[in-house]
């Protein structure tokens, strides 16, 4: 949004990681002017009022699903021809529903390897689509809500506005709500009637200064650690006013027996002194990034933990349901794997080397088991560099010593 705004936008509280650096690097490759101060966690972006400074080029998005989906949509709305490349991991993740709707809007997309996947060549629609032609598309978001977020984010580039009908059973979600709220903060309003999304013509992003929220997804690992060990965690500036759906994980911890409180510094989680957790059945559709975190806690519960409505996580950095089942089995924990759910039975984990599948959330979540069980080793722990490169240093700093 900062790149598409008119003028200079300053972003404060930026999380620097492999994903965000690949996104910023892609913007630089497209000719956008940025100033980066990692120590101050500030990025300044010179927006180009809904245009791309160059009309050809190649970008590399790494393993970042957000960069892959958002930048593909942005380039499809632009003028020129571009190549989008990605890591081997990202090349396996679904893109076809987004490609299909972008082609319906007039973009030309050529898959350079496997049909429906990156890498691709994109020829944008600007200058080739009649300015008065109504833009109306249908979209299936069952595989990823990022497809819809991508279209919404670039909708101000479409002068005649955009109408999106959602054809999948799922119509909305926590990340879509975040997208809409942030767009509104930047001056672009999205209407939603329960079935369809409407963006009026003439919408523009306004430049300014934007304070980014703390990463609640990252905070949840440390909140889970408190619940698991009977300890206490406060994450600065994480409050109930945050937009992120992963706040629901804190309510889940409360239902499992942890104490959740407000403090002047941020939300606090205190685990039961005996470290005991209750079994639970939960629909995690809207905060599925924490599925692995809950799976790591589940063996220590007093009953079964059943996680439902998570079939879409099979299509993320790894087949996450299968990865959870496999690694819990390596720990000696029994579970029942289903197409879109998993039931985990309580037990006593044994020492094991946990495989991470180059999935940052597998590495971070399963490290929590090691807080209660000796002999837990995480293979390829630095895959967490994708979103939280200092995770293990932070975790180590919080662990008490004899």
Where are these regions (language model features)?
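Structural preference for solvent-exposed beta-strand-turn elements
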Residues: 1-402
């Amino acid at each position: 949004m900062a790149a598409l705004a008119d003028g200079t936008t300053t972003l404060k509280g930026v999380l620097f990681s492999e994903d965000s650096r690949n996104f910023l690097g892609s913007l630089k490759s497209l000719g956008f002017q940025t100033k980066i101060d990692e120590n101050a966690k500030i990025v300044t972006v010179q927006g180009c009022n809904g245009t791309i400074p160059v009309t050809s080029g190649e970008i590399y998005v790494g393993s970042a699903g957000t960069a892959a989906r958002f930048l593909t949509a942005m380039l499809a709305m632009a003028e020129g021809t571009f190549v989008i490349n990605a890591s081997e991991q990202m090349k396996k993740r679904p893109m076809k529903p987004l490609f299909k709707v972008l082609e319906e809007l007039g973009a030309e997309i050529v898959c350079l390897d496997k049909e429906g996947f990156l890498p691709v060549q994109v020829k944008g629609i600007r200058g080739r689509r009649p300015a008065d032609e109504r833009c109306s598309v249908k979209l299936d978001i069952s595989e990823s809500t990022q497809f819809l977020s991508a279209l919404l984010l670039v909708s101000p580039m479409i002068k005649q506005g955009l109408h999106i009908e959602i054809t999948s059973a799922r119509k909305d979600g926590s990340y879509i709500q975040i997208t809409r709220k942030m767009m509104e903060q930047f001056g672009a309003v999205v209407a939603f009637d329960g079935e369809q999304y409407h963006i009026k013509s003439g919408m523009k992003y306004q430049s300014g200064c934007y304070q980014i929220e703390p990463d609640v997804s990252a905070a949840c690992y440390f909140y889970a650690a408190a619940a698991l060990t009977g300890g206490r965690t406060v994450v600065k500036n994480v409050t109930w006013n945050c937009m992120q759906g992963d706040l629901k994980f804190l309510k889940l911890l409360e239902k499992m027996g942890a104490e959740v409180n407000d403090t002047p510094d941020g939300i606090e989680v205190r685990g039961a002194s005996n470290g005991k957790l209750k079994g639970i059945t939960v629909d995690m559709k809207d905060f599925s990034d924490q599925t692995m975190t809950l799976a790591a806690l589940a063996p220590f519960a007093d009953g079964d933990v059943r996680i439902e409505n998570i079939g879409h996580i099979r299509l993320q950095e790894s087949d996450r349901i299968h990865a959870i089942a496999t690694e819990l089995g390596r720990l000696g924990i029994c579970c029942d794997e289903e197409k879109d759910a998993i039931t985990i039975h309580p037990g006593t984990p044994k020492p094991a080397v946990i495989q991470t599948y180059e999935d940052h959330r597998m590495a971070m979540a399963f490290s929590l088991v090691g807080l209660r069980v000796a002999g837990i080793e995480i293979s390829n722990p630095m895959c967490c560099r994708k979103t939280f490169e200092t995770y293990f240093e932070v975790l180590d700093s919080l662990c008490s010593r004899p």
